[in-house]
Amino acid sequence: MQRSSVLLCLLVIEATFCSLLMAQPDGVNTPTCCYTFNKQIPLKRVKGYERITSSRCPQEAVIFRTLKNKEVCADPTQKWVQDYIAKLDQRTQQKQNSTAPQTSKPLNIRFTTQDPKNRS
């Protein structure tokens, strides 16, 4: 009986520690890293990118996000990658400029009030 009580106590302690470990949020501050690079993909399939410069990753990389939300790792030193980044930045800038509110010249309106005593 004493043996089973000790065993039960150990199981309860283990379950407590396991539940504490499992309660930790997944992926806290874990960067996305690229370990291999993909070949060039068509620019028309790319909608955005992210630079990976974390010290936790073995190498710097660029992750392109496709229209189908797939991530493609690329070497930032390759010319096609640099060209894509420049074109995507240009696209983003154009979108920001087209959605910015248009400013117009101020209207020169002069408000005048009539003197109630001087009504004609």
Curated annotation (Swiss-Prot):
Residues 93-120 have a biased composition (Polar residues). Glycans are attached at N97. Belongs to the intercrine beta (chemokine CC) family. Disulfide bonds join C33-C57, C34-C73. CDD domains: Chemokine_CC. GO terms for biological process: antimicrobial humoral immune response mediated by antimicrobial peptide; chemokine-mediated signaling pathway; eosinophil chemotaxis; inflammatory response; positive regulation of cell migration; positive regulation of synaptic transmission, glutamatergic; sensory perception of pain. The keyword Signal applies. This is C-C motif chemokine 2. Residues 91-120 are annotated as: Disordered. Acts as a ligand for C-C chemokine receptor CCR2. Signals through binding and activation of CCR2 and induces a strong chemotactic response and mobilization of intracellular calcium ions. Exhibits a chemotactic activity for monocytes and basophils but not neutrophils or eosinophils. Plays an important role in mediating peripheral nerve injury-induced neuropathic pain. Increases NMDA-mediated synaptic transmission in both dopamine D1 and D2 receptor-containing neurons, which may be caused by MAPK/ERK-dependent phosphorylation of GRIN2B/NMDAR2B. GO terms for molecular function: CCR chemokine receptor binding; chemokine activity. Keywords: Chemotaxis, Cytokine, Disulfide bond, Glycoprotein, Inflammatory response, Pyrrolidone carboxylic acid, Secreted, Signal. It comes from the Eukaryota. Monomer or homodimer; in equilibrium. Is tethered on endothelial cells by glycosaminoglycan (GAG) side chains of proteoglycans. Interacts with TNFAIP6 (via Link domain). Residues 1-23 form the signal peptide. InterPro entries: Chemokine_b/g/d, Chemokine_CC_CS, Chemokine_IL8-like_dom, Interleukin_8-like_sf. Processing at the N-terminus can regulate receptor and target cell selectivity. Deletion of the N-terminal residue converts it from an activator of basophil to an eosinophil chemoattractant. N-Glycosylated. Gene3D superfamilies: 2.40.50.40. It is found in: Secreted. GO terms for cellular component: extracellular space. The modification Pyrrolidone carboxylic acid is found at Q24.
